């Protein structure tokens, strides 16, 4: 019997592609053949996949971008992609098809439904994306990176967690040093593009902290390129020691050394914080589709691992009070860190592998 084939279908964003890559790496190590089905945009994110993974570029499209003519052509492009996927699957039959969301996953998942192949999806956020919501009732397993996840009626989800980078796993459950009268680290993460509202509010909020906290505080603040100068100046005016950059290459190390993290609540950020196990103040991106960042934060907040502040309620005074509450109560901060760890899923990739192998065994 030859090597079983796993067909991974994923859209062209890092959020879809990273967990897809983690699963691909794990399945290749287990002796599977792996193919990635994506569009031209997704192929640009596939550079980190194992070199043995075949990449099939499919015809697809989205109703979210382009003019009226481009949107009118989307159904025909998707239909062509589905037909091509069916032909490809008949020629080289996958043992399992896994969708990670995004319009480019439609052809492969549709072909899997038509041919009754074992199939599953993985959703990174606490609200299903459009494509995953469409296929959730039509697959054999719905794996959830965030818990709880808002699922269609009658659909059961399995909480696998979101796969994270090796650098994060290396620091999983790193010992937490509670706040005290010694140097403390505060990390501010604005997501992949930084966050203007955090740059507007956080420096002033920190400047309002009690003097005994400020004397020990060291800050690492990720900001948009156009905000770096003014954020740096704001910290300098307040006499605060701060590193302000558009991107920190060593975020896992900084998280492991932090007493408190202030962050957006993108799925990968919440996963990183929970696996390392740190208290957090989360400010969901208000314009996120279906308010999924609030959904991402919900379980973390309910576990008493984080404080949630909606953008509409974010101001220097209230944020300063929340920061002070965490940094002045060592035992409470320690408990938040423990709660964060309990919510994390450092074995997310292994859980996904188990579902794939279970579906493959059922088929045989």
Curated annotation (Swiss-Prot):
Catalyses which reaction? di-trans,octa-cis-undecaprenyl diphospho-N-acetyl-alpha-D-muramoyl-L-alanyl-D-glutamyl-meso-2,6-diaminopimeloyl-D-alanyl-D-alanine + UDP-N-acetyl-alpha-D-glucosamine = di-trans,octa-cis-undecaprenyl diphospho-[N-acetyl-alpha-D-glucosaminyl-(1->4)]-N-acetyl-alpha-D-muramoyl-L-alanyl-D-glutamyl-meso-2,6-diaminopimeloyl-D-alanyl-D-alanine + UDP + H(+)
Q: Which gene encodes it?
A: murG
Q: What is this protein called?
A: UDP-N-acetylglucosamine--N-acetylmuramyl-(pentapeptide) pyrophosphoryl-undecaprenol N-acetylglucosamine transferase
Q: Which keywords belong to this entry?
A: Cell cycle, Cell division, Cell inner membrane, Cell membrane, Cell shape, Cell wall biogenesis/degradation, Glycosyltransferase, Membrane, Peptidoglycan synthesis, Transferase
**Protein EC:** 2.4.1.227
Q: How does it sit in the membrane?
A: Peripheral membrane protein
Principal location class: membrane
Keyword Cell division appears in the UniProt entry: yes
Return the InterPro entries for the record: GlcNAc_MurG, Glyco_trans_28_C, GlycoTrans_28_N
Any GO MF annotation of the entry: UDP-N-acetyl-D-glucosamine:N-acetylmuramoyl-L-alanyl-D-glutamyl-meso-2,6-diaminopimelyl-D-alanyl-D-alanine-diphosphoundecaprenol 4-beta-N-acetylglucosaminlytransferase activity
The record ties this protein, via Gene3D superfamilies, to: Glycogen Phosphorylase B
Checking SUPFAM superfamilies in the record gives: UDP-Glycosyltransferase/glycogen phosphorylase
């Amino acid at each position: 019997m030859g090597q079983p084939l796993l067909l991974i279908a994923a859209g062209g964003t890092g959020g879809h592609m990273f967990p897809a890559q983690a699963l691909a790496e794990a399945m290749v190590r287990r002796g599977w053949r792996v193919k990635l089905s994506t569009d031209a945009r997704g192929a640009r994110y596939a550079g980190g996949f194992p070199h043995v993974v075949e990449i099939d570029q499919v015809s697809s499209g989205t109703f979210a971008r382009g003019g009226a003519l481009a949107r009118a052509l989307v159904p025909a492009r998707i239909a062509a992609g589905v037909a091509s996927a069916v032909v490809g699957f008949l020629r080289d039959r996958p043992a399992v098809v896994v969708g990670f969301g995004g319009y480019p996953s439609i052809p492969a998942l549709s072909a899997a439904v038509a041919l009754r192949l074992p199939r599953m999806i993985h959703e990174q956020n606490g609200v299903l994306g459009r494509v995953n919501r469409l296929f959730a009732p039509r697959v054999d397993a719905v794996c959830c990176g965030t818990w709880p996840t808002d699922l269609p009626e009658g659909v059961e989800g399995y909480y696998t967690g979101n796969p994270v980078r090796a650098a994060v796993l290396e620091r999983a459950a790193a010992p937490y040093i509670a706040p005290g009268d010694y140097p403390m680290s505060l990390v501010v993460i604005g997501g992949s593009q930084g966050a203007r509202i955090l740059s507007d509010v956080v420096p002033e909020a920190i400047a309002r902290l009690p003097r005994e906290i400020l004397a020990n505080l060291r800050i690492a603040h990720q900001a948009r390129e156009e905000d770096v100068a003014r954020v740096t100046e704001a910290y300098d005016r307040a006499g605060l020691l701060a590193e302000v950059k558009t991107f920190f290459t060593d975020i896992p190390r900084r998280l492991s050394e932090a007493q408190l993290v202030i962050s957006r609540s993108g799925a990968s950020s919440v996963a990183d914080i929970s696996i390392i196990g740190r208290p957090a103040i989360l400010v969901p991106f208000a314009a996120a589709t279906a308010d999924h960042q609030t959904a991402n934060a919900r379980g973390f907040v309910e576990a008493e691992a984080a404080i949630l502040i909606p953008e509409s309620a974010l101001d220097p005074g209230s944020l300063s009070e929340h920061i002070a509450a965490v940094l002045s109560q060592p035992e409470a901060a320690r408990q938040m860190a423990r709660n964060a760890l309990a919510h994390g899923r450092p074995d997310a990739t292994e859980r996904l592998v188990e579902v794939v192998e279970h579906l493959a065994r059922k088929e045989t």
